[in-house]
Amino acid sequence: VQFARDNRILYQGRGSAANSVVCYCLEITAVDPRQINVLFERFISKERDEPPDIDVDFEHSRREEVIQYIYSKYGRERTALAATVISFRFKSAFREVGKALGFAESQLDYVIKNINRRDRTVPWQTQIENCGLSSANSKVKQLISLVEQIVGFPRHLSQHVGGFVISAKPLYELVPVENAAMSERTVIQWDKDDLETLGLLKVDVLALGMLTAIRKAFALLNEQYPQEVSIPFITRLGDDQQVYDMICEADTVGTFQIESRAQMTILPRLKPRCYYDLVVQIAIVRPGPIQGDMVHPYLLRRHGRESVSYPSEEVKSVLSRTMGVPIF
């Protein structure tokens, strides 16, 4: 983080780290948690069965600078990226088994394009017959059998999106390591779950394309205004009601987190007017609240069309900010 700050690389802490005053004081995050009334306990709770996890996003276009800084500071012997195990999915399994058995690539492509895996009423084993592969053929039988066996089986190792392991000792004394396909990178041959089981500390150095866009926007603004524009500067300005007027009209194309069609559909109905309203807005357009039928009750209560009630008085303090609806 200090390296990024010194080199004017935009970054931001994500997740529950934003609840931490310490992270704010260290400038890992830019929002004062006292201003937004978050739960400190979520980050430092004794009930957690693992150490606090701090994920940091860096500009997508400059993350490699941060990665190489970590390697140069700690050495490639003591620093490496975690691996991700890539497993066979149906298409890759079907294609590779088919090629090994001598089927033409054009035939395999045709079958893959015409199989509907979402159709649970017709098994894929039956669908391939409609594509000209008869299950009476011994080679087709072998193809079906082998595909069924290797779907879900590990295919190859890839690099984790940003999970770094930093050790006091050379990593090769603790875990198997290898050089990555990308130059100047080292990869541990185990995934993050294996590393957590061993108790090795993983630090996530993540990339976010929107931070690159924000930095470019700051550069344009700084050409026009004497006050240097930055994320901390903007967060100190507080809520801008003209911006919220645009948000309520779903004028949010290119706006991080609220630019999807689903978000833009809900924005005029929820009508966010402050930061916490946006927190609810982003959270409510997710599978959990949608499948749990929590969207409509919240909207009705927010606009006074339904009375606010609580399952129990014991949860009132927890659910009061979301009007009795368990969105989070």
Which ranges hold each PLM region?
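Alpha-helical scaffold/interaction cores of sigma-54-like transcription cofactors
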Residues: V1-I327
